[in-house]
A protein has these predicted regions:
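Non-heme di-metal
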Residues: 1-165
Length: 165
């Protein structure tokens, strides 16, 4: 777990370093940070797989929801209280705001878990616009097609079209 955590931390750190290098006008350095970050992701995946940490999607959604619940209900709440006690009110507010985001993440994962359990991931119950994530084909119906009639990708590539613009 330590190797996985270390590689994961390094990946994020190098990604942030890349953004700073790019902002400072160092494209080559930014690209090398990103290349190294991707290497670190690959290393993290090796250790993650050895840990057997990725189960079935239902199990992963349950784990993700539990992790998000812990973050908003315990971790960020405790961090906010400690920051406030130490006089860092601005940081306490950030912890509370991030906690609210984590609560929304938990809701999202629980909704997705319910959809998987109820076999509703690719069904809407009413006519909907399903978009192929590979080629953009639009299918109108209560369920996504088994395969895209344009590019042949399986149902897994379809999602209900989000028109939030």
């Amino acid at each position: 777990m330590t190797a996985f955590s270390g590689e994961s931390l390094a990946r994020n750190k190098y990604t942030f370093f890349a953004a700073k290098a790019r902002a400072d006008g160092f494209e080559q350095i930014a690209n090398l940070f990103l290349e190294t970050a991707d290497d670190e992701r690959a290393h993290a995946e090796i250790w993650f797989n050895y840990l057997g940490a990725a189960g079935k999607t239902e199990d992963n959604l349950t784990s993700a929801a539990a992790g998000e619940h812990y973050e908003w209900a315990e971790m960020y709440d405790a961090f906010a209280k400690a920051a406030r006690e130490e006089g860092f009110d601005d940081i306490a507010v950030k912890f509370e705001l991030v906690g609210k985001i984590e609560s929304e993440h938990e809701k999202r994962f629980n909704k997705l878990l319910k959809n998987v359990k109820d076999n509703e991931v690719f069904r809407s119950g009413t006519a909907a616009m399903w978009v192929c994530g590979n080629c953009g084909h639009i299918h109108i119906g209560e369920a996504a097609p088994e395969n895209c009639p344009v590019c042949g990708k399986p149902r897994a590539y379809f999602a209900i079209k989000a028109e939030n613009y």
